[in-house]
């Protein structure tokens, strides 16, 4: 078999915004139009990102960077992220969302209700990129031309973000984790981990891997994207113990029997959460709020910490049962984290 190992990684909307912001600040302060800029990322890597254009005027400069999605199918691929910079009188960096950036209308998301949909991690990325240029006070306005139109074809409205796209990203890098060929990469990575460990921690995404690294050696953790079921099958044949560690929204799909969690394969997150909440005996008024929520994160805001623990214990037990049903001999453990990284449930560990 010939494996295409030259998969192209992309950049997140947050990385594109950080690069555009840095290029705009350089234009504002140095009157210089850069073709590329280098930005820091939360994981320590530095990215050199092309800049499409820089416009410099009196007291303001704007720059555009195109979102590049690599080999991930993404409706945002090629979308322009525009940042405009001007000085302010403080020593602070103020980041605001302009036209084409969505507004948060429901609770439970990382951005506060009423604010623009720019994640805290992205705000930190933008600030760190600008601080490599200046210590002065800067106002950055992030815009996305046609972002309101593009957003109509995303899931934003379903989670309470309206009027534009979200500016997101936990690492700055977009990994082609949902590609079929990625299974070959997973096989290779599992073999490497097996040389040092008799167990493996399967984490669907970056946040899950980050939280799991507080409990396990980071070298024992593999990020598998949407291919949770396939990864468990592969791992169960070579490891003494397999640990699935994830956040509620992703694992609620597994609770429903969806082992490839890509959105094209199905979605039963809120239905699963409602079902588990009924089994946990949550009050009717809380159940009503959960069924009317637009996201798992929003639904969690209506539950106490103890209620979350009871519900996620049921979810973890059902996942364990499902995994055992197709591989009864597996030594399997499920850990579900809250959105702040705290462990809500551990079953089979």
Curated annotation (Swiss-Prot):
InterPro entries: CbiD (IPR002748), CbiD_sf (IPR036074). GO terms for molecular function: cobalt-precorrin-5B C1-methyltransferase activity. Pfam families: CbiD (PF01888). Its EC number is 2.1.1.195. SUPFAM superfamilies: CbiD-like. Pathway: Cofactor biosynthesis; adenosylcobalamin biosynthesis; cob(II)yrinate a,c-diamide from sirohydrochlorin (anaerobic route): step 6/10. Signal peptide: none annotated. GO terms for biological process: anaerobic cobalamin biosynthetic process; methylation. It catalyses: Co-precorrin-5B + S-adenosyl-L-methionine = Co-precorrin-6A + S-adenosyl-L-homocysteine. Keywords: Cobalamin biosynthesis, Methyltransferase, S-adenosyl-L-methionine, Transferase. It is an enzyme of class 2 (transferase). HAMAP family: CbiD. Belongs to the CbiD family. This is Cobalt-precorrin-5B C(1)-methyltransferase. The lineage of its organism: Archaea, Thermoproteota, Thermoprotei, Sulfolobales, Sulfolobaceae. The gene is cbiD.
